[in-house]
Structures are given as C-alpha cells and as structure tokens.
Amino acid sequence: MEWSDVFHEITTRHDFAAMHDFLEKEYTTEIVYPDRKNIYQAFDLTPFEQVKVVILGQDPYHGPNQAHGLAFSVQPDAKFPPSLRNMYKELQDDVGCIRKSPHLQDWAREGVLLLNTVLTVRQGEAHSHKNIGWETFTDEVIQAVSEHLTHVVFILWGKPAQQKIKLIDTSKHHIIQSPHPSPLSAYRGFFGSKPYSQANTYLQANGKQPVNWCESEV
C-alpha cells in the first residue's frame, strides 16, 4: 500500500474542494508556509509501508525560512525553535547523541512520520488555517496507519496530540505520551520521559529495526 492509495480512500470519503479553493486564494494573496511544493513532504520522505514511528505536531512554524513540511523540523540554516531545542536536550540525555542541525529529514527517511495535524499556516498567524479541513485529512491519515500497519509507535506530546489516541488501535500499536517539549511544559514531565529509547525498545521487541535518532548524512 502506498500513500496514493491512502489519499484515494480519504478523498472518496470526504470533499476537500472548499479547502482547496481556500488554499488557492491564500497562496495567491498571502504569504503561506510551507512552500506549496513542501506541503506533503512528510509523505514524500516517509513511504507508507516504512512508517515505524509517528510524531504528531500541530501547525507549521509561521516564520520565514522555517517550515518545510515536517513537524518540529526547520530548514537547515534556520534558528533552533525552543521545542526542537528541548527535543534535542532530551535526545542527548536519553540516547547520548548530540544533533547540530535543526533539519529532521534523516528522521523522516528512517521511517519517522513527522505529521502536523494542520499542514499550512499564514505567515505570523499561528492556527490561521485551523478548521479549514486539514484536521479531517490528518485524522484519516492517522487512522489509515493504525488500520493498515502494525507495531507503529505513536509519540503524542501535549493534550492536542493526545486527543488523537481515540483514532489508534492500541492493541497493535504503542503509545508514548508526555507533556509537550515547549518551554512552557518541558519541565512538567517531558524531560526524563525517554521517548526515543522507548520507541526503539518497542520496535526491536517486535522485529523492527530501531530508528537512528542521531545525526546522519542524507
């Protein structure tokens, strides 16, 4: 099964014409992130059958030279966002590796689906594309992963992500949840939660290759 099959299933159940029209207008009249060509980059870099881990974000970063279609990741020459800095701090404490690039393309190629629940945003306006249809689309994506694959690790940071548990068959997948890595909540239980080693322990116990969370050339 490929993402094209998943998208076909989704679009036969839902009409996204209104969202498509809205986005056409937004990209024509406003500055919107990510670039059009990168909206679906998470799916381009992580083939459906290779998904081992899903990390859920909310909407893309809304500053210049940041969002490129992968949740939590920014372009290589961008400044580190605070949440990503905290993710890397926990990564170092958990598995002992230091990442220097804020770009997570290598994770995506390792089978980590870095999925925002909303895939576009207007510059400088967080949540500006909330409730235009993306949530319906990405809920269906989560359900498709849950239905068609087995032994996937879902990493859910913060309450919005944890509300998606109802979409996941927990009898055949593994949920890792903790507070969000943002500075507002990282010290309330994100630090010390060891999500990276937990994910690999589960994957290996179920006959899958662990994720190389450390920096690698792509």
UniProtKB/Swiss-Prot annotation:
Its main location: cytoplasm. GO terms for biological process: base-excision repair, AP site formation via deaminated base removal. It catalyses: Hydrolyzes single-stranded DNA or mismatched double-stranded DNA and polynucleotides, releasing free uracil. Keywords: Cytoplasm, DNA damage, DNA repair, Hydrolase. Its EC number is 3.2.2.27. PROSITE patterns: U_DNA_GLYCOSYLASE. Excises uracil residues from the DNA which can arise as a result of misincorporation of dUMP residues by DNA polymerase or due to deamination of cytosine. Belongs to the uracil-DNA glycosylase (UDG) superfamily. UNG family. This is Uracil-DNA glycosylase.
